[in-house]
Amino acid sequence: LISLKDSIDSGDIDLITRVYDTVIQQSATSMMRTNYEISSLDNIKEAVIRSIMNSKLLEAQYLGIELYIEIPDVIDHLPIKLIDLIVLFTGLVDNAIETAKGSRRPFLSIAYFKQDNKQLFIIENSTKTNRVDIAKRFDAQQQNSAHFLTVLDSYPQITLSTKSDHYRLRQLLEMR
């Protein structure tokens, strides 16, 4: 848009046309090819969580990661403080995006639903390697991991399970 404004300011019609053709039209085309629909997040009633999830999913999509989202239940009650849920969700999604990048067929799948008296947040993604060493990932991102683990440890009613094999990583956050 800045390039377009500069070309308009210069009054050069050829430059305006060239900027439009190379920048604006290509951007519009790539935005139209998206497979992710923001309405997939409609059942998350907390606007902040919905907004952050949307931002992270658009980031993944921009990186060429195929997205699959399933949120069948209305999520209108947060089992923990909002700020802590943000830390946990962003940590899990960031981890999934990072490990999916560069994989053969990058994908990220999120399911968030209620079961009995629990909320389950499951995120699964492709990986570059057969197995991801989760402990090494936490060591490599020590500062972010420390905050993530502190939040996780402060809620005994929350369980995080991870499994990695067959070029996939699965993270399950169970909140009672």
Regions found by a protein language model. Give the residues of each.
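Heptad-repeat coiled-coil segments of the DHp/HisKA dimerization-phosphoacceptor module
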Residues: 69-73, 114, 127
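Short beta-to-alpha transition helix within the HATPase_c
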Residues: 18-25, 41-63
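Glycine-rich phosphate-binding loop
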Residues: 133, 144-168
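Conserved ATP-binding N-box helix of the HATPase_c
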Residues: 4-9, 82-106
